[in-house]
Structures are given as structure tokens and as C-alpha cells.
């Protein structure tokens, strides 16, 4: 659901107008992010802008906007940077052959590679660049998780928010297992998964058993799990949030693989403001259970 693009630094260095045009096309809510490839991508943009715009107000404006780019626009790539002595496009194509980007946006395409989009010709009608902030999905555990898979692969903290979350039920446990597997393999140390559900009047001992009987059996080493309870009246919406963005699920985080519920769901990627509000709402509470 979220596309990751490699964007040549020189594309942003021709003018402030071009810089703004491209940056505004990206963000988790739009279904597109820029891969921070290589790690010093911002430095490369500024150096290219210096070469083209030294002594102009445009350079200063680019410098300011470059510092303000948020994590939901420029996503940590976690990829090797390749041979720094090679041109950026050669490095990007080498990485693309190993772990494909959704596309590569560059000033030119000397090798006529089908996945390289020339910046001056790019528009929203190009199917390679098209992306959507909302999508109907089949309610399978794989599709539920894949909507935010790119974010989970970079996440340090994840919040699963569903007022009825019950890991003793297979329809939630399947999705939870997939999330934990992605967090186990995302290469970060000290990853935390939070589960937020309602305090619906279930006896505390019974609520505790929901999690004690399942979480220790599926929690991978290196991932801590915390459970939070909230007043039932305060919980309505369902989200998967990560520290780099998130999505809302209109029906729930449970799948319909057993065929007893709604077969589809509408998933919406969150704008930066909505994400910040929901992240704050589900932060700062005392945990009901912690599994380390």
C-alpha cells in the first residue's frame, strides 16, 4: 500500500520550485515515501543545490525545508549505500536489483531501465508513480499487515489498537503473529509492541489470562510486548501505528479467514496531524501487562 521510491538528490537541486514540487508528492498519507538512500541522502541534496544555487535565496530555502523533512516523508532505508565512488543512479540500480524499490526517479535514464522515471516527465498518471491513501482489502491477516509492512520493517515502536483485541482468538492471533515476525526481522534492537484494547468489564484475572496464555508462546526474543487497557467508551477506532506512521482499519484488526464476519475492510493511511493525535492519545498510560 505504501510505495518506496529512490529519488536522485540532483532532482531536488535545480530550484526551490522543483524541490517543493517533488517533496510535496511524498508522505505516508499519500502512499509514497522517499527512501533515504544512501544514508547521507540529505547531504547529497544540499551539496548538489550548493553547486547549482550558491549565493541565492533559493539555496537557503532548500536548506530550511531539507531540515524539516519528516520521517513519514523520508523513510530510513536500512539498505547498504553501495560504492560511494559510483554515480548515484548506478548505486540505486544495483540496490534495486537486490531489493527493488517501487521506482527510481532521476534526471535521466541512460540505460533505458523500465523502472527509472525521468523527473521532468513524471506526473500522477504514470502507473509506476500512482499511489493511494485509501484501499479496500480482503480481511486476511496477510493483507491487514501488508498495508503497513514497509513501516513495520523500520519500526522501533508499534501500537496495535482495537477495543476487542483478544489473542486467544485465532482471528487476532494470526495477525499478531505476522506483526511479531516482521518486528523480529527488522534488524532493530529493543523493539516494543504495544497492544491497546478496552477494559470492557471482564474480570482482571480473565483479561490477564487472555494475554498470559498466548503472548509468551509467540513473542520473539528481542521484542517486548506491553498491554494497555482503556475505558470502553473512549475506544472506537482501530489502528496500527508505528513511530514512522500508521493506518486506520474501519472494521478491525482481526481477520475473516474463518468466514464468520465482514469479508472486506477499508484501510486509510493517516495524515501527519491525525497520526500525531492518535499517537499522543495512546501514550503515557500505565501498562496492564508487560512481557520481556
Residue ranges and their predicted role:
Residues 166-170:
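Acidic-and-aromatic substrate-binding clefts and catalytic sites of carbohydrate-active enzymes
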Amino acid at each position: 500500500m505504501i510505495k518506496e521510491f529512490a529519488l536522485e538528490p540532483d532532482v531536488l537541486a535545480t530550484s526551490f520550485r522543483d524541490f517543493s514540487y517533488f517533496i510535496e508528492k511524498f508522505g505516508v498519507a499519500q502512499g509514497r515515501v522517499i527512501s533515504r538512500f544512501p544514508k547521507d541522502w540529505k547531504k547529497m541534496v544540499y551539496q548538489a543545490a550548493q553547486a547549482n544555487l550558491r549565493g541565492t535565496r533559493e539555496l537557503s530555502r532548500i536548506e530550511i525545508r531539507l531540515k524539516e523533512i519528516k520521517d513519514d516523508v523520508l523513510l530510513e532505508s536500512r539498505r547498504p549505500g553501495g560504492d560511494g565512488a559510483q554515480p548515484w543512479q548506478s548505486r540505486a540500480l544495483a540496490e534495486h536489483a537486490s531489493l527493488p524499490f517501487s521506482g527510481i526517479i532521476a534526471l535521466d535514464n541512460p540505460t533505458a531501465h523500465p523502472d527509472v522515471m525521468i523527473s521532468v516527465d513524471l506526473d500522477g498518471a504514470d502507473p509506476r508513480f500512482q499511489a493511494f491513501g485509501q484501499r479496500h482489502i480482503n480481511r486476511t491477516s496477510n493483507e491487514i499487515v501488508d498495508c503497513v509492512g514497509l513501516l513495520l520493517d523500520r519500526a522501533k515502536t508499534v501500537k496495535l489498537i482495537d477495543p476487542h483485541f483478544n489473542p486467544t482468538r485465532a482471528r487476532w492471533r494470526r495477525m499478531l503473529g505476522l506483526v511479531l515476525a516482521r518486528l523480529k526481522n527488522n534488524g532493530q534492537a529493543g523493539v516494543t509492541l504495544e497492544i491497546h484494547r478496552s477494559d470492557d468489564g471482564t474480570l482482571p484475572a480473565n483479561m490477564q489470562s487472555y494475554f498470559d496464555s498466548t503472548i509468551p508462546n509467540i513473542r520473539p526474543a528481542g521484542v517486548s510486548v506491553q498491554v494497555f487497557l482503556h475505558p470502553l467508551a473512549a475506544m472506537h477506532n482501530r489502528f496500527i501505528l508505528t513511530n514512522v506512521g500508521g493506518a486506520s482499519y474501519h472494521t478491525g484488526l482481526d481477520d475473516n479467514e474463518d468466514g464468520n464476519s465482514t469479508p472486506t475492510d477499508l484501510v486509510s493511511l493517516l495524515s501527519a496531524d491525525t497520526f500525531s493525535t492518535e499517537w499522543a492519545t495512546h501514550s503515557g498510560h500505565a501498562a496492564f501487562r508487560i512481557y520481556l
